[in-house]
Amino acid sequence: MRVLALDTTTREGSVALVENKRIVDVRRGDGSRTHALRLPGEIVTLTDAHRWRLSDIDLYAVASGPGSFTGLRIGIATIQGLASVHRRRVVGISALEALAYAASADLVPGARIAAWMDAHRRDVFTALYQVTGEGPFSRAHLSAIEDAAVSSPTAVLARWQLLDPAFSATFVGDGAVLYESAIVATSPANVVKPLPDLAGAIGVLAEERASEAVAPSAIRPLYVRRPDAELARDEKLLAAKESSKGM
């Protein structure tokens, strides 16, 4: 089975080709250009490099979120368009789950993986997993301890320490790198890994779950948090109310 996978949850994002659960190639995007401008060219360049035609793709995969609202919309719309034209189905994969799978290869059963993505506004998108020991990229390989959420780094760390006073984990993602000092200060046993290119993991996970593929129109983004524009509007309204109370 041939899979084309996209990740547009970060500024750079990535595009990958996967065949028979093997990553053929994965390429990071040019963060200086918007996803909308560069994605079509990046997809054509990658498929041409391996002499794949878009009509040869059996399954399309995309990071469903969380991440940049604009990036998510562009990535999902791109995959929907390609899948619709070629009459293929689509699998959406959580970027946090893909992060955890990408980081789990060298971890022993029982190890915990904390996927952290920078959510801006001094927050992180987080999810917590535990390695079960089943085959890599199988659904049973990771067990979700805590599903996708958004919060401040200190609040997340405090919550997990309440879960286990001796809490430690492998933290992965750009959010983990950004807040590495707080993570390591909480426990010297915590390990921080950088954000990998996710499209490859997304493609392998999608092929593993091909039986769950849906029609292109059925893919829905995983936002976790409301758009920044709405949050900024609410903050202005709250500030205006507080100001009026003081008059």
Name every feature range the model reports, one short phrase each.
Residues 1-66:
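N-terminal beta-alpha supersecondary unit
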Residues 22, 34, 89-197, 213, ...:
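Surface "functional belts" at beta-alpha junctions
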Residues 30-38, 69, 73, 77, ...:
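Residues at secondary-structure transition points
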Residues 47, 206-214:
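Short, hydrophobic alpha-helical segments
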Residues 61-95:
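DPxDG-like acidic metal-binding loop motif
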Residues 98-102, 202-208:
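Short alpha-helix plus adjacent loop in nuclease-associated cores
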Residues 233-247:
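Nucleotide/phosphate-binding catalytic cleft detector across ATP-hydrolyzing
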